[in-house]
């Protein structure tokens, strides 16, 4: 049901009848439907075949807030560094870093890897989040998020 929070832009959709019956939300997505009324966000725990738990965050465009600073950092109870594609276009404006007394959401502008690779978020289309501790006396927080939403 997490997919129902996305307004998907699907080029082609092949939905076999057995999938449609087993997962009815796929038929709704095929018809261009998605969640437009509260709740406009959803957090679910997904479990891998190996038993590892993953938190999945979903939101609709109607929510009108930043996924990372308004949902992810609060749920993780951690400050986060967010790297997303930094291309502004039309009415999409890159969001600034958000610093407050409990959790900060910082926009990562550059990535420097140990094997002499360096690139900026302007050139990179990936999206990821790394949780961190603002106090050097606290151990790092063990969260890494992989996403598909820009901070715009």
Predicted features, each with a name:
Residues 1-152:
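PLD/PLD-like phosphodiesterase catalytic module centered on the HKD motif
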């Amino acid at each position: 049901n997490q997919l129902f929070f996305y307004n998907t832009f699907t080029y082609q959709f092949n939905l076999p009848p057995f999938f449609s019956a087993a997962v009815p939300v796929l038929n709704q997505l095929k018809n261009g439907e998605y969640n437009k009324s509260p709740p406009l966000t959803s957090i679910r725990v997904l479990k891998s075949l190996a038993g590892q738990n993953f938190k999945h965050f979903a939101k609709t465009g109607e929510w009108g807030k930043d996924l990372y600073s308004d949902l992810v950092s609060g749920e993780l109870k951690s400050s986060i560094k967010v790297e997303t594609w930094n291309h502004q276009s039309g009415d999409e404006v890159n969001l600034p870093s958000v610093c407050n007394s409990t959790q900060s959401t910082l926009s990562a502008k550059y990535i420097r890897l140990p094997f002499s690779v360096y690139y900026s978020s302007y050139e990179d289309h990936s999206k990821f989040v790394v949780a961190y501790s603002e106090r050097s006396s606290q151990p790092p927080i063990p969260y890494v998020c992989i996403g598909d939403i820009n901070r715009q």
